[in-house]
Amino acid sequence: MNNIFSKLRDFVGLNEQVEYEYYEEEPETDNNYQNLYQQENPQPPAPQESATAQNRRWREPVPTMGDDIAAGSKPMGNVIGMPGAINGISEVLVLEPRTFEEMPQAIQALRERKSVVLNLTIMDPDQAQRAVDFVAGGTYALDGHQERIGESIFLFTPSCVQVSTQGGVLHEVPQPPARPSRPTGSPNQTWGNETNRMAQ
């Protein structure tokens, strides 16, 4: 039995000796270190210059986030706007593709938060099925939704769009869950009740 495991380890390569290569560096003398340090780092500025710079920093008002918003200045650099949400206008793209090669346009539109109506009446039925499968997969990957509207006509929407009919809502936009309120009782009392239930 041990023989089988050793053969398996040999096959996988776990029994191989690991060879480490060591390089020995010559110890540097204190002179070389000091010379190297002085060449790399210039001398600090004169004390008077740094004192005036500190005074300038002390006297200048520091803008706060509220000041930036109130002044209507540019938002922080790490905030990225959502395409299509600039004016609150939603866009619907109607595609009537002739070939499968036009399908990445539909996926790109979904990535830009646009709804896509795909009319596949012009396409060959096999190509149309392939196109629907492709766009449906992309829609699923983007947490979007799909709905068949008619014969060879499909609606693909991003996750931020609510789809409804006269009979009711087919898909609602998920709302963030509300946090449950915490009990006002003491935590020790609740813990004690749980241990009593467990002991019984």
From Swiss-Prot:
Q: What is an annotated GO biological process for this record, any one?
A: FtsZ-dependent cytokinesis
An example of a Gene Ontology cellular component annotation for this protein is: cytoplasm
Which terms are listed as keywords in the entry? Cell cycle, Cell division, Cytoplasm, Septation
Q: List the disulfide bonds.
A: none
Compositional bias, Polar residues, is annotated for: 183-200
Q: State the source organism's domain of life.
A: Bacteria
Region of interest (Disordered), ranges: 35-60, 170-200
InterPro entries with a match to the protein in the record: Cell_div_SepF, Cell_div_SepF/SepF-rel, SepF-like_sf
Q: Please give the Pfam families that the UniProt record associates with this protein.
A: SepF (PF04472)
Asked if the Swiss-Prot or TrEMBL record annotates the protein with the keyword Transmembrane helix, the reply is: no
**Compartments, as annotated in UniProt:** Cytoplasm
Give the record's subunit note: Homodimer. Interacts with FtsZ.
Q: What does this protein do?
A: Cell division protein that is part of the divisome complex and is recruited early to the Z-ring. Probably stimulates Z-ring formation, perhaps through the cross-linking of FtsZ protofilaments. Its function overlaps with FtsA.
Report the family membership. Belongs to the SepF family.
Q: What is this protein called?
A: Cell division protein SepF
Q: Which organism is it from?
A: Nostoc punctiforme (strain ATCC 29133 / PCC 73102)
